[in-house]
């Protein structure tokens, strides 16, 4: 979607990046509100102006740093974990101090892992595909954390933490892709 179309302060549809217009009187946007109001809705829409002002003044929330991991169990001992897993740090409060006060990547983050057992999610019988998510400060170039730098190093720290938790990721790691808050 390139634009949410609005006429007389009512939605009329969307325009795609290839110029196709799809008519609709209802639009559901599951995206960041700032992106919607500043990128998808024309600056000429008067009904959106007050929302833009509110968003500009609002304190921004946290974000996420994710890893997509492909694991090859022929390279190391597999561990048995559930489909959904959450590993909490010893000092949960410090996670939010890092995010909101210091505005730095979390030193000891809560880690969520989705490890589906569906064979259609992997390349073979001895493989696993994990989605790993940790809380992170939002991408903010001025006065916050600039996620255009340091993503690979932070991904390695998370892998080390997974190993420390006994999940034996490093020796089995066959594929890794990470996404920072700047990518979202």
Give the positions of each predicted feature.
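Beta-strand segments within the central parallel beta-sheet cores of soluble alpha/beta enzyme folds
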Residues: 1-2, 24-25, 172-178
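Mid-domain catalytic core of redox enzymes
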Residues: 2-124
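C-terminal segments that line or cap access tunnels to active or ligand-binding sites in enzymes
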Residues: 72-184
